[in-house]
């Protein structure tokens, strides 16, 4: 793709998301979502082949359906309230329909089926945009309507998402699918706390984006797409492999790494609100996520691919790609937990 064209497309994606996040008029919010969706499709098809074409088509059909539901919710709310403003409380029916539309856009269970399929069919860089930037707009609207959202609906979807996100990733060997299922599980954690403490959901989103960006950056640096390709990494880049190991364990939510912080805070907040069964169920199902990340770390660092080369480091295959941006990302992805006392400000 022409660099100028690609830059314009990325600018449109950012503009669409910014419009959604800053607008106070429901019609403008809907237009922002449409701009964002239509601009991201060429990014998904950056490397043109039948697989990416299929992924982009699946993405378009899902997002178009979600946009239709979103517009239906906006119209129902307009009929009952006569207001276009996003600051006014939503009608209960409109709120349920809008929650379902946003769940479809986020890939929450039971609307999650498109996420692994689309992520698997596109490049790693496009997958990074899909699983990080594309979550910002729907989460921001969910944040705005959190006071009128149906709590039982959100909790049911969040428990299902955490369970499916863990269960679906167990037998996978494709890294993109594993990251997609991880994304479904993380979205489940975010929606569980959205009604009780929306600010904490945003904290979870920031940490999730940080961890996912770091993991994808390492995958892109080594062109890794399967668990088998991870076993080659130790010979080429041992330091980077160690960093990836820590980041993946952090994504799984293992203490004392950064990924444990949002889970800990969410479980604490839900328990404070006299909800014990929900956090207990989510904590148990989160172990599935941790298990498949432990499998990944095993294939990354504890297995060495058979080689006829006696040298421990393959110096002739030195990577020339820039890695300067990875240093702060890796530090933030693994060492945020000591800052947790500051987060009492959220309460």
Swiss-Prot record:
Alphabetical list of Pfam families matching this protein: NADH_dehy_S2_C, Proton_antipo_M
Species name: Eidolon helvum (Straw-colored fruit bat)
Gene: MT-ND2
Subcellular location: Mitochondrion inner membrane
GO cellular component terms, A-Z: mitochondrial inner membrane
Family, similarity comment: Belongs to the complex I subunit 2 family.
Cited function: Core subunit of the mitochondrial membrane respiratory chain NADH dehydrogenase (Complex I) which catalyzes electron transfer from NADH through the respiratory chain, using ubiquinone as an electron acceptor. Essential for the catalytic activity and assembly of complex I.
Identification of the protein by name: NADH-ubiquinone oxidoreductase chain 2
Reaction catalysis annotation: a ubiquinone + NADH + 5 H(+)(in) = a ubiquinol + NAD(+) + 4 H(+)(out)
Transmembrane portions of the chain: 1-21, 25-45, 59-79, 96-116, 122-142, 150-170, 201-221, 242-262, 274-294, 326-346
């Amino acid at each position: 793709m022409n660099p100028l064209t690609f830059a314009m497309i990325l600018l449109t994606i950012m503009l669409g998301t910014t419009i959604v996040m800053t607008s106070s008029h429901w019609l403008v919010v809907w237009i922002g979502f449409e701009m964002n969706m239509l601009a991201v499709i060429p990014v998904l098809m950056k490397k043109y082949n039948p697989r990416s074409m299929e992924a982009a088509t699946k993405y378009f059909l899902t997002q178009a359906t979600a946009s239709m539901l979103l517009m239906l919710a906006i119209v129902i709310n307009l009929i009952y309230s006569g207001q276009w403003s996003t600051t006014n409380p939503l009608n209960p029916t409109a709120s349920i329909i809008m929650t379902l539309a946003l769940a479809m856009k986020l890939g929450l269970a039971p609307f999650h089926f498109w996420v692994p399929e689309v992520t698997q069919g596109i490049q790693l860089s496009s997958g990074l945009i899909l699983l990080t930037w594309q979550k910002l707009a729907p989460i921001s609207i969910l944040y705005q309507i959190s006071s009128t959202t149906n709590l039982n609906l959100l909790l049911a979807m969040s428990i299902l998402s955490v369970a499916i996100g863990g269960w679906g990733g167990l037998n996978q060997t494709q890294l993109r699918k594993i990251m997609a299922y991880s994304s479904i599980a993380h979205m489940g954690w975010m929606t569980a706390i959205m009604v009780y403490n929306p600010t904490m959901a945003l904290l979870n989103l920031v940490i999730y984006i940080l961890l996912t960006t770091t993991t994808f950056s390492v995958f892109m640096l080594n062109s890794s797409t399967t668990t088998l390709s991870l076993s080659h990494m130790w010979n080429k880049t041992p330091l980077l492999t160690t960093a990836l190991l820590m980041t993946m364990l952090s994504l799984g939510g293992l203490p004392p790494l950064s990924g444990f912080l949002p889970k800990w805070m969410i479980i604490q907040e839900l328990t404070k609100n006299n909800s014990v069964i929900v956090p207990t169920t989510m904590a148990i199902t989160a172990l599935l996520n941790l298990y498949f990340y432990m499998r990944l770390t095993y294939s990354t660092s504890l297995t060495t691919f058979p080689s006829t080369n006696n040298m421990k480091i393959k110096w002739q295959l030195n990577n020339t790609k820039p890695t300067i941006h990875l240093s702060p990302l890796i530090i933030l992805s693994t060492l945020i937990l000591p800052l947790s006392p500051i987060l009492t400000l959220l309460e």
